């Protein structure tokens, strides 16, 4: 059997340069991705007590302690391609909402102050705001009374109320979000009976309209 031919020094150098080039390009791509993600419009829901997004990103060290402290596995660290900058904590309301622990263990676990450890009351948390985005799909707008989002709301009759409205000559019971009371916990979105939730929780700066009104029509 012929002895395998050993690669020449030139081949070794060439392969080494190619590998270094690939590694360099991958590193540049990752750096560009992280930079672009950090500058992207905030779309992720942050843990309770989070600082304003820019301050939060500056203070968060991506340690994951808040994720480990959450007893309901609500929080997770963002992976590449997700809606939050890489390694930062966020949650997806449709999957697992915030259960609004009164002792706020996630915030207390934060070592840098990216989450306010002295948040006085979980009801003062500002994770986002619920918005009725699917008027055409919401059962109430079809004349079918559905009160799921109202019934599951942990601040029922304050954050979400049911109001009788006359729409196109028909009296309907419509869920109405009061943005000054909503914490953005996401329980309403989680339990919406539709395949694609008609009510969604968005970061407050996205969920509120330009004139200080919730897109559903409620004043801030």
From Swiss-Prot:
InterPro entries: 4Fe4S_Fe-S-bd (IPR017896), 4Fe4S_Fe_S_CS (IPR017900), MauM_NapG (IPR004494), TAT_signal (IPR006311). [4Fe-4S] cluster 2 binds at residues 70, 98, 101, 106. Disulfide bonds: none annotated. Pathway: One-carbon metabolism; methylamine degradation. [4Fe-4S] cluster 4 binds at residues 153, 182, 185, 188. CDD domains: DMSOR_beta_like. Residues 50-80, 88-120, 173-204 form the 4Fe-4S ferredoxin-type domain. The keyword Transit peptide does not apply. Keywords: 4Fe-4S, Electron transport, Iron, Iron-sulfur, Metal-binding, Repeat, Transport. Pfam families: Fer4_7 (PF12838). [4Fe-4S] cluster 1 binds at residues 60, 63, 66, 110. GO terms for molecular function: 4 iron, 4 sulfur cluster binding; metal ion binding. [4Fe-4S] cluster 3 binds at residues 138, 146, 149, 192. The keyword Protease does not apply. Involved in electron transfer. This is Methylamine utilization ferredoxin-type protein MauM. It comes from Methylorubrum extorquens (strain ATCC 14718 / DSM 1338 / JCM 2805 / NCIMB 9133 / AM1) (Methylobacterium extorquens).
């Amino acid at each position: 059997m012929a002895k395998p031919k050993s690669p020449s020094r030139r081949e070794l150098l060439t392969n080494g340069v190619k590998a270094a080039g690939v590694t360099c390009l991958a590193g540049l791509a990752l750096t560009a991705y992280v930079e672009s993600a950090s500058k992207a419009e905030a779309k992720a829901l942050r843990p309770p007590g989070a600082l304003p997004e820019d301050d939060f990103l500056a203070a968060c060290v991506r340690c994951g302690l808040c994720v480990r402290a959450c007893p309901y596995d609500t929080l997770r660290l963002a992976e590449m391609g997700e809606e939050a900058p890489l390694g930062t904590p966020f949650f997806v309301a449709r999957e697992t909402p915030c259960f609004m622990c009164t002792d706020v263990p996630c915030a207390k676990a934060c070592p840098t102050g990216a989450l306010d450890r002295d948040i006085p009351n979980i009801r003062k948390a500002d994770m986002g705001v619920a918005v009725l985005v699917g008027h055409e799909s919401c059962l109430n707008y079809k004349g079918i009374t559905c009160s799921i989002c109202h019934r599951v709301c942990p601040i029922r009759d304050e954050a979400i109320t049911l109001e009788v409205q006359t729409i196109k000559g028909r009296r309907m019971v419509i869920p109405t979000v009061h943005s000054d009371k909503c914490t953005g916990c996401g329980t309403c979105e989680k339990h919406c009976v539709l395949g694609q939730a008609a009510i969604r929780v968005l970061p407050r700066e996205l969920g509120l309209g330009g004139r200080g009104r919730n897109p559903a029509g409620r004043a801030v």
